[in-house]
Amino acid sequence: MAAPRSCVLWSYCGHGWSRLAGDCRLPGFRRSWLGATLSARSLSQEKRAAETHFGFETVSEKEKGGKVYQVFQSVARKYDLMNDMMSLGIHRAWKDLLIRKMHPLPGTQLLDVAGGTGDIAFRFLSYVQTQHERKQRRQLRTRQNLSWEEIARKYQSKEDPLGGSLVMVCDINREMLKVGKQKALARGHTAGLAWVLGDAEELPFDDDRFDVYTIAFGIRNVTHIDRALQEAHRVLKPGGRFLCLEFSQVNDPLISRLYDLYSFQVIPVIGEVIAGDWKSYQYLVESIRKFPNQEEFKDMIEDAGFQKVTYESLTSGIVAIHSGFKL
């Protein structure tokens, strides 16, 4: 999610390899010593260039960032419950598939952007821990000459259960991160996990830092999607992988009509009943319809420098997983 640059306050905890963001200008704002000599026509053109959409509403780029921030601040506490209610739980299967496609091995360094409540991060940690345990068992089986005492000591040793894996959860919204941290404590996730307040359009990390970049149901809320994609490319190591799970375009006419009916007539009502917030869920539905289709988004990913870009549509195209590599 993007917000006005003037609202961004970088924060970091857990490791010392990130950098703080410096002063930023507002998106679309241009200083000029010509000042008053700018013509009315050029001012009008600049104003149009700085316009974007907030759902079906046309707003300034500066205004969109603040509006999106307020949406997720409002829904943070009920965000996970609403995901279950709106998707009838299917979002869990989509996220599980994203992790299986990633197939992270022990030692993988993951950046999960717009991942505030931790759904992707927790799945990643569970997956790599399972992979690490399997690796350990294979190693023990190949060392037939170990005594039972040596085997017991190895299992009881306090080595990293994740095999050196790390997931950084980066989100621009403090409330979403707060919910994620509370969930992590409740589930006992402490090792290999850190939380960062940051903007997808200007990530507070060094170049060539991560093995994998994920963003699930977040990139459509970014003001400048192209900038977020360029940042994803920058922070990935050579050979690193970009994975995006996002709502997309339904490819069946009948299902599309039913989906529209459910989206516009049912989801805002659920939002009002469960979260007491009709408008936020009306925006979320509208933002899905404004997002590029599968092929258009694939082109945007390629324009950012990624190669071998592919996508897989799920549930008749309601969502899609896009994948690309930094080569």
Swiss-Prot record:
Keywords: Membrane, Methyltransferase, Mitochondrion, Mitochondrion inner membrane, S-adenosyl-L-methionine, Transferase, Transit peptide, Ubiquinone biosynthesis. Pathway: Cofactor biosynthesis; ubiquinone biosynthesis. It is a peripheral membrane protein. It catalyses: 2-methoxy-6-(all-trans-decaprenyl)benzene-1,4-diol + S-adenosyl-L-methionine = 5-methoxy-2-methyl-3-(all-trans-decaprenyl)benzene-1,4-diol + S-adenosyl-L-homocysteine + H(+). GO terms for cellular component: extrinsic component of mitochondrial inner membrane; mitochondrial inner membrane; mitochondrial matrix; protein-containing complex; ubiquinone biosynthesis complex. Residues 1-49 form a transit peptide. Its main location: mitochondrion. Coiled coil: none annotated. One of its GO terms (molecular function) is 2-methoxy-6-polyprenyl-1,4-benzoquinol methyltransferase activity. S-adenosyl-L-methionine binds at residues 117, 171, 199-200. GO terms for biological process: methylation; ubiquinone biosynthetic process. It holds the Pfam family Ubie_methyltran. Its EC number is 2.1.1.201. It is found in: Mitochondrion inner membrane. Methyltransferase required for the conversion of 2-decaprenyl-6-methoxy-1,4-benzoquinol (DDMQH2) to 2-decaprenyl-3-methyl-6-methoxy-1,4-benzoquinol (DMQH2). Belongs to the class I-like SAM-binding methyltransferase superfamily. MenG/UbiE family. Component of a multi-subunit COQ enzyme complex, composed of at least COQ3, COQ4, COQ5, COQ6, COQ7 and COQ9. Interacts with PYURF; the interaction is direct, stabilizes COQ5 protein and associates PYURF with COQ enzyme complex. HAMAP family: MenG_UbiE_methyltr (MF_01813). This is 2-methoxy-6-polyprenyl-1,4-benzoquinol methylase, mitochondrial. It comes from Rattus norvegicus (Rat). The lineage of its organism: Eukaryota, Metazoa, Chordata, Craniata, Vertebrata. The gene is Coq5.
